[in-house]
């Protein structure tokens, strides 16, 4: 989600990818295709036993919450950020971090 909910062009690309990979019918709605892709990603994460949150990864929530502003600042400075399909702002990143803690 995050990028798909903010950029329709990106959502269409992910929907197309979902159908190409066989997670959804080409005739399904883009919303259904995106849902199927997300389900497949979550299933893969669980199969590989990947942490679903930063807390599960071993990041202490109580220690991290006071550092959310710094984490967002650093993310905005990261070279990879400029390739993100949606130009998230500082508040967007804080919200994302809160969701995955």
Task: Name each region found by the language model.
Residues 11-101:
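C-terminal charged capping/lid subdomain of soluble metabolic enzymes
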């Amino acid at each position: 989600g995050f990028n798909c909910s903010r950029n329709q062009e990106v959502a269409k690309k992910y929907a197309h990818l979902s159908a190409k990979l066989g997670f959804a019918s080409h005739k399904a709605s883009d919303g259904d295709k995106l849902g199927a892709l997300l389900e497949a990603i979550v299933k893969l994460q669980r199969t590989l036993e990947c942490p679903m949150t930063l807390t599960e990864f071993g990041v202490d929530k109580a220690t991290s919450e006071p550092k959310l502003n710094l984490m967002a600042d650093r993310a905005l400075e990261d070279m990879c950020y400029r390739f993100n399909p949606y130009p998230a702002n500082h508040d967007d990143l804080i919200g994302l971090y809160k969701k995955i803690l």
